[in-house]
């Protein structure tokens, strides 16, 4: 049966209206790894301010060049406590800000000592941070996991090496399909090790400072 012209117009307008309705964008899933040096402490403030825009799967403290282990300073816990004070006001603008208790529950320590700057798999010891990355890459959530290396990438290298060595080929394939590594230059040997030994992993390097202190992008 041929549809009347008026009915055709109504159907067309209805479909057009549906297509014009904005779809809720899926939040990117993020694990941030940080060395706790002063630039990262500043970045963490901004990270928390924008935490309504992404799904925080983990915050992992990793190695830096200035001293052994910033985790003992409890600087992230202090920042999250301040975030909790601001949370009621933040949620007036966006209800999607995560609970402070949740952020503390996904906080872990990775390979954070300066000596780990010079170690590579399989010489790195296991860590809570590596296990958090492993659990996230192997869980049932199919979304990509954007692992942001503000400091070194040895903890990420350690986690990926463990998955490839200790888990099934199917689980390794799942990890490969989900992992998205972003490195703010290779601050230890981990990023280059992943690039050379696990070429199937998607990895981006942002660049390194030149002698004038400027940043050049090599992504």
What are these regions (language model features)?
Residues 11-20:
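Hydrophobic h-region of N-terminal signal peptides that target proteins for export
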